[in-house]
């Protein structure tokens, strides 16, 4: 190949990169809800999912790396009335409908159904995807409706007709077992806030000998995840690689943890996980929130006291421990800081941003745009949202924001970025969460950033502001863990939290453990069994004089 030809091809390739392809004749979608499926007017988010494959069903693989989405809001759509999704009406991800490349696809319509709710706390009337407190994404949420999968051809224009005929049924709740008990607790505080019953679900893992040692009370670890604590399972047929440590996560299988849990001379704990979904996200983060309600107060004043009445828990601060990773890591630290006298220890693993000067890679107090960083006087570069442990960019923050906006307007995506806004942020004039940045332009709203700081959601800032009283209470209770190449750049805020603590007398001894090299978001420093052993030793070390710390270690 001649040099001249090479230069020409490079120039053509560069032009192709700069100019997005446009389908000459993009299709439109005419979506109708069968009156037999729903006869009443429908408000919600209609998403037409367009995939290159028929299986799994397109709706079941909705994700940032998944199929194309084309979405519109529905406002009291009458049964049988068609909704039009076209190049003018639809927000598209990852490309506009007009830029969907020609070819063969499989299309499916899904509606995230909204319910009209008047929030008792402020009297605001909202349209929201409600739930009963269990963790349900829109693809499988009870009451949402969808169509069959239909093969389509893109590039020839025309109208694709999709008919919604199916309703997602309730998901059966797991049954209690010998080891695992499930409890539903109504919160009066949250019920008063919403003006309707609100529940928190707890999954309680019993220690070996719980039914035999009837006079023993146990320390409790609250694991802020949504599954059975520590992935516990006595069924060896449900797991692979028994006896091996996962090279990525650093933890054992659920069956190997079960063997440790029931072994001799293992510290006997009760372990509890929670489901506390809100209309805006899969988890409340266990804090009081303008949008979600007083989940923090509910947790420490209602939910945990209720569990302590139902199970033989010691029920004293030294014997209440918190542990969590990612979402759960942020919750764990927030609970230990905001209810410092209630919990006796916090194991904070790869937490969501705990210093908002590193809200992932965004400084929400000084940056003006979340999507880009200046790299010269005249140009900018895209800000990443996720990377591999080798540093390869997988999604940009612009892509993630567009994805969430496609899932739901008015902070109703039920995904991560809008979930944070509903937890940390103020309300807009209508009563919906106020976005931290515009999801299409990236422009940061500094008033929202300042609200988050002033109301204590930037946990480093909150701790620093209150450290004179917090330090002596919590420094000996904190333990931090993070991989050096966290997929979502969460280690950067952990470094800044450590810098603050190292500047204080109380904080100098707080342990920070980092996974190196190339340890990502799911990394753990020790196995689950070893973590519980460390927790047992911590409880013994910090138990007040006169407390029996031998009865539960058998």
Residue ranges and their predicted role:
Residues 1-2, 24:
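Initiator methionine at the very start of the polypeptide chain
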Residues 7-8, 22, 354:
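Short amphipathic alpha-helical "recognition" segments used for binding
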Residues 9-10, 24, 305:
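A periodicity- and composition-biased signal for non-globular, repetitive helical segments
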């Amino acid at each position: 190949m001649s040099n001249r030809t090479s230069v020409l091809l490079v120039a053509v390739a560069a032009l192709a990169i700069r100019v997005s392809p446009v389908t000459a004749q993009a299709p439109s979608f005419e979506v109708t809800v069968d009156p037999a499926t729903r006869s009443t007017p429908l408000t919600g988010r209609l998403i037409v999912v367009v995939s290159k494959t028929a299986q799994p069903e397109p709706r079941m693989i909705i994700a940032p790396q998944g199929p194309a989405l084309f979405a519109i809001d529905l406002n009291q759509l009458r049964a049988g009335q068609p909704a039009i999704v076209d190049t003018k009406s639809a927000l598209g991800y990852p490309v506009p409908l007009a830029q969907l490349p020609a070819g063969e696809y499989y299309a499916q319509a899904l509606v995230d159904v909204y319910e009209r709710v008047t929030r008792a706390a402020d009297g605001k009337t909202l349209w929201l995807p409600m739930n009963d407190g269990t963790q349900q994404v829109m693809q499988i949420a009870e009451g949402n409706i969808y169509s069959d999968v239909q093969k389509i051809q893109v590039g020839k224009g025309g109208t694709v007709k999709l008919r919604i005929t199916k309703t997602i049924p309730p998901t059966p709740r797991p049954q209690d077992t010998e080891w695992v008990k499930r409890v539903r607790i109504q919160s009066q505080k949250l019920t008063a806030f919403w003006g309707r019953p609100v529940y928190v679900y707890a999954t309680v893992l019993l220690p070996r000998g719980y039914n035999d040692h009837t006079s023993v009370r146990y320390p409790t670890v609250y694991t802020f995840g949504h599954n059975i604590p520590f992935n516990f399972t006595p069924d060896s047929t449900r797991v692979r690689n028994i006896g091996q440590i996962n090279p990525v996560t650093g933890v054992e299988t659920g069956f190997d943890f079960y063997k440790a849990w029931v072994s001799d001379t293992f510290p006997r704990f009760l372990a509890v996980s929670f489901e506390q979904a809100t209309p805006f996200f899969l988890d409340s983060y266990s804090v009081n929130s303008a949008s979600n309600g007083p989940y923090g107060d509910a947790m420490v004043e209602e939910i945990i006291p209720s569990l302590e009445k139902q199970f033989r828990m010691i029920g004293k601060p030294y014997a209440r421990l918190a542990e969590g990773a990612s979402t759960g890591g942020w919750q764990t630290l927030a609970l230990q800081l905001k209810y410092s006298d209630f919990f006796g220890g916090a194991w904070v693993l790869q937490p969501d941003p705990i210093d908002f000067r590193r809200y992932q890679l965004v400084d929400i107090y000084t940056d003006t745009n979340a999507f880009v960083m200046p790299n010269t006087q005249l140009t900018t570069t895209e800000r990443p949202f996720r990377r591999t442990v080798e540093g390869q960019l997988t999604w940009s923050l612009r892509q993630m924001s567009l994805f969430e906006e496609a899932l739901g307007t008015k902070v109703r995506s039920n995904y991560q970025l809008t979930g944070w806004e509903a937890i940390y942020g103020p309300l807009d004039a209508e009563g919906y969460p106020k976005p931290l940045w515009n999801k299409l332009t990236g422009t940061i709203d500094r008033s929202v950033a300042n609200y988050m700081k002033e109301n204590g959601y930037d946990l480093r800032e909150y701790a620093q502001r209150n450290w004179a009283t917090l330090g002596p209470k919590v420094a000996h209770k904190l333990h931090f863990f993070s991989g050096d190449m966290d997929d979502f750049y969460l280690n950067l805020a952990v470094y800044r939290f450590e810098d603050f603590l190292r500047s204080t007398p109380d904080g100098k001894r707080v342990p920070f453990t980092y996974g190196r090299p190339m340890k990502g978001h799911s990394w753990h420093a020790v196995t689950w069994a070893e973590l519980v052993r460390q927790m047992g030793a911590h409880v013994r070390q910090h138990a007040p004089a006169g407390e029996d710390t031998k009865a539960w270690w058998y």
